[in-house]
Amino acid sequence: MSVIAGVSGAVGAHKYSQEQIVAHFAKIVSPLGKDAAIIDRIHTATEIKFRNLALPLDAYADLGGFGAANDQFIRIGLDLGASVILAALNQAGLKGEDVDFVMATSVTGLATPSLEARLMPVLGLRPDVKRVPIFGLGCVAGAAGIARVHDYLLGHPDDVAVLLSVELCSLTLQSDDRSMANIVASGLFGDGAAAVVMVGERRAAAMGIHGPRVISSQSRMYPDTEAIMGWDIGGSGFRIVLSASVSEVITQYLASDVTAFLGNHGLKITDIKQWVSHTGGPKVLHAIEESLNLHEGELETSWRSLAESGNLSSASVLHILRDILEGRGVEKPKSGTPGLLLAMGPGFCSELVLLEW
């Protein structure tokens, strides 16, 4: 097993109400006001109250092409990435020189050398640290990242590993895209980063770390779903692909996947005492609640995160994990009880991670 020793999250520096963002977005993508009513209706339906952005609202109209946006992704992503990793290491009682393995994920910008490579001198990482940058997992990458770091630590029980997520979704804005997918996505996504520090079993015992234990994980790809979520990448950057059938796939498959996965560990859905679910959006959260027959309030932390920050892609589920561990608006889980962390993303796919609090 592996142990979660620290979790930290951060959001973009510029906070706006959903109403402010809606009004500004409408001016950019529909300057003549033809789509203003539908933009307002769809963005209001997200149930989001606030979002934090990487840049001031006025900067987006003059951002220019993909190159300029990606430059901002690297600049701001490095600042956010450094802050969350240092905070998570501090929680764990560790320093940069203690880190043996770093996995970094983002689907909202590109960097070569990758972000974690550029952060090495800032964080004080050793030159022999193992690095695994990831692109393409999207919203599922927070859960999948914890699962893959866990896999690594099973084979390296004395090691310290860091998972970094940086998602600056607003920088992918396509001002000429009046598609329903772009209107919906622009009303959902916010900007943020998160880091998780995990340690192997022997390292946890030696340091006396008693955080949540990662017990097991399950990855699942769903047939004939490649076209329902992702990017159409072209000269202008990342153009959103997003189908209304996402919630239908969740309804069709999630309950059987969760039931089988938990059954392999002698558990049932009703045994899970704390759910750590990616936010998605209202339709996604409703689909999860209905398919798993969850009681009102069991995804309260996810709903609150969605309202306060929007969907932060891969960072969302990590922010929710942090909120639960810190008892933000929710009772901290009792030691020894089971929890399930889950997320979905492009593929279309899901990742389930069994925790013991």
Where are the model-predicted features located?
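Claisen-condensing/thiolase-fold acyl-transfer catalytic domains that form or cleave C-C bonds
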Residues: 82, 107-108, 121, 126-128, ...
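Short acidic, glycine/serine/threonine-rich loops at helix termini
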Residues: 15-16, 113-117, 144-147, 172-178, ...
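Acidic-glycine-rich active-site phosphate/pyrophosphate-binding loop
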Residues: 110-125, 164-175, 226-231, 285-299
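Short, well-ordered amphipathic alpha-helical segments that serve as non-catalytic structural scaffolds
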Residues: 76-92, 115, 193, 249-264, ...
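Conserved beta-ketoacyl condensing-enzyme motif
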Residues: 40, 46-136, 269-285
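Phosphate/pyrophosphate-binding loops at sites that engage ATP/ADP/AMP, CoA/4′-phosphopantetheine
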Residues: 84-99, 205-207, 256-273, 292, ...
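Short beta-strand segments
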Residues: 6-8, 105, 135, 160-167, ...
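Condensing-enzyme catalytic core mediating Claisen C-C bond formation in acyl metabolism
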Residues: 1-75, 175-252, 256-260, 344, ...
